[in-house]
């Protein structure tokens, strides 16, 4: 599988979809593409990702056009909608309930959208929301 990590383009969003240590694990059985400077806001360099086994690409278009799975932090913005490919999988915080526009746009892409905020563990808890809740207080 080809996994793509684009640089977040939402204002004041400095997080990155995957840290180099996770890329290191994933790159053992997958190809991982990271957009140049995607990790800068989280203090990760392109070299950190290269050393973890990723390939650095220059543009967000390269990420979307070449990846089967996109791993982000925040929902796609309007200028990303046309980059999403049919049958592509997107893994991010979507918050669909807050945006009918986003929901309809993602339906039109015919992609598979997996929202972090809806993933439950066996006990019914939302493990991907817990770290964000702790940070937010």
Give residue spans per PLM region.
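N-terminal phosphate-binding or glycine-rich loops at protein starts, especially the Walker A/P-loop
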Residues: 1-36
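Glycine/serine-rich phosphate-binding loop and adjoining beta1-alpha1 elements at the start
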Residues: 2, 76-137
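Redox-cofactor binding/interface segments in oxidoreductases and associated redox assembly factors
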Residues: 5, 65, 71-72, 91-92
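Alpha-helical segments flanking ligand/cofactor-binding loops in enzyme cores
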Residues: 24, 47, 61, 81-82, ...
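Anion (oxyanion) recognition and catalysis
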Residues: 27, 50, 107
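N-terminal beta-loop-helix "entrance" segment that forms/cooperates
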Residues: 33-56
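Short, polar loop motifs at secondary-structure junctions
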Residues: 39-40, 74-76
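Short acidic low-complexity segments
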Residues: 53-66
């Amino acid at each position: 599988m080809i996994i793509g990590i684009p640089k977040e383009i939402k204002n004041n969003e400095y997080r990155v979809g995957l840290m180099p240590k996770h890329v290191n694990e994933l790159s053992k059985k997958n190809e991982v593409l990271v957009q140049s400077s995607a990790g800068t806001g989280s203090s990760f360099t392109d070299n950190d990702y290269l050393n973890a086994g990723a390939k650095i690409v220059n543009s967000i278009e390269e990420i979307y056009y070449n990846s089967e799975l996109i791993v982000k932090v925040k929902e796609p913005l309007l200028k990303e909608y046309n980059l999403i490919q049919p049958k592509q999988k997107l893994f991010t915080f979507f918050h669909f309930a807050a945006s009918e526009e986003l929901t309809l746009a993602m339906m039109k892409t015919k992609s598979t959208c997996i929202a972090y905020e809806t993933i439950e563990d066996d006990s019914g808890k939302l493990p991907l929301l817990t770290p964000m809740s702790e940070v937010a207080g």
